[in-house]
Curated annotation (Swiss-Prot):
It catalyses: a primary alcohol + NADP(+) = an aldehyde + NADPH + H(+); L-gulonate + NADP(+) = aldehydo-D-glucuronate + NADPH + H(+); L-gulono-1,4-lactone + NADP(+) = D-glucurono-3,6-lactone + NADPH + H(+); allyl alcohol + NADP(+) = acrolein + NADPH + H(+). Its main location: cytoplasm. One of its GO terms (biological process) is negative regulation of apoptotic process. The gene is Akr1a1. It is found in: Cytoplasm, Cytosol; Apical cell membrane. This is Aldo-keto reductase family 1 member A1. Its EC number is 1.1.1.2, 1.1.1.372, 1.1.1.54, 1.1.1.19. PROSITE patterns: ALDOKETO_REDUCTASE_1, ALDOKETO_REDUCTASE_2, ALDOKETO_REDUCTASE_3. It comes from Rattus norvegicus. Widely expressed.
Length: 325
């Protein structure tokens, strides 16, 4: 049985498998959370922009706390600061709104969702007349200093980053008095992120993989993109070990000490996704999966401009995916 959590530099234990909640519809996410907690999940990944934190809060209220199924201190809850709330004055109100929605007194981890800021306000995707996004000039280093105050106030136990490049991580570290503990990025065998993971681990950050199964349910999915869950190497290992393809992909990550947050609302899959600690890959099997890397990124936010689908933020000076890693 391999260890099912990693130790953050804050001393917190972060479970290697958590339940992702992106695209989990209100009306379905509450039951998914309650089921996940009942089968042993102790890590839930949330974000204000997912629009479902209120319902997640209802599930947490029923299942977590004194006299409930799960003591609060056994649960690791992450949420994320959205792009419209990067202005230092907006950071604390944003986390307080998330805490109220989740019905929690503190978060275990709070991430800056993206490095760039959108125009301030309550519209999560402020747009110009031509369909492009309205940005705000707040730099992530200013936002980081405001996030640090949340730790001092006890609202948040640890801070982290999401969708930041290696250069941007170092930029935050250069001003941080509270060091980031986690980087959350897209990661799976087609986008192995080896350089970025090594960069983080050398600096005391753990890495969380989002879309670890390849996110085949995206709205902007392209018909000819490769499907990770149908990859022959993955299917062959699944057959050999008597496991599902998803379990193969998750086992590869946890064996690399990378945290995963697969999203599901289906009980059988929620259960399956956490059953990855009772088998191991040989070094040769790990190499087979490592060899699938092709730096294929599924999650690039797209918008329609003049009738064409284009990457939404690729022209922004803080866009993270123009860097080599």
């Amino acid at each position: 049985m391999t260890a099912s959590s990693v130790l953050l530099h804050t001393g917190q234990k972060m479970p290697l498998i958590g339940l992702g909640t992106w695209k989990s519809e209100p009306g379905q996410v509450k039951a998914a959370i309650k089921y996940a907690l009942s089968v042993g999940y102790r890590h839930i990944d949330c974000a204000s922009v997912y629009g479902n934190e209120t319902e997640i809060g209802e599930a947490l209220k029923e299942s977590v706390g004194a006299g409930k199924a799960v003591p609060r201190e056994e649960l690791f809850v992450t949420s994320k600061l959205w792009n419209t709330k990067h202005h230092p004055e907006d950071v604390e109100p944003a986390v307080r709104k998330t805490l109220a929605d989740l019905q929690l007194e503190y978060l275990d981890l709070y991430l800056m969702h993206w490095p760039y800021a959108f125009e301030r306000g309550d519209n999560p995707f402020p747009k110009n007349a031509d369909g492009t996004v309205k940005y705000d000039s707040t730099h992530y280093k200013e936002t980081w200093k405001a996030l640090e105050a949340l730790v001092a106030k006890g609202l948040v136990k640890a801070l982290g980053l999401s969708n930041f490049s290696s250069r941007q991580i170092d930029d935050v570290l250069s001003v941080a008095s509270v060091r980031p503990a986690v980087l959350q990025v897209e990661c799976h065998p087609y986008l192995a992120q080896n350089e970025l993971i090594a960069h983080c681990q050398a600096r005391g950050l753990e890495v969380t993989a989002y879309s670890p199964l390849g996110s085949s349910d995206r709205a902007w999915r392209h018909p000819d993109e490769p499907v990770l869950l149908e990859e022959p190497v993955v299917l062959a290992l699944a057959e050999k070990h008597g496991r599902s393809p998803a379990q193969i992909l998750l086992r590869w990550q946890v064996q690399r000490k990378v945290i995963c947050i697969p999203k599901s609302i289906t009980p059988s899959r929620i259960l399956q996704n956490i059953q990855v600690f009772d088998f191991t890959f040989s070094p040769e099997e790990m190499k087979q999966l490592d060899a699938l890397n092709k730096n294929w990124r599924y999650i690039v936010p797209m918008i329609t401009v003049d009738g064409k689908r284009v990457p939404r933020d690729a022209g922004h000076p803080l866009y993270p995916f123009n860097d080599p890693y």
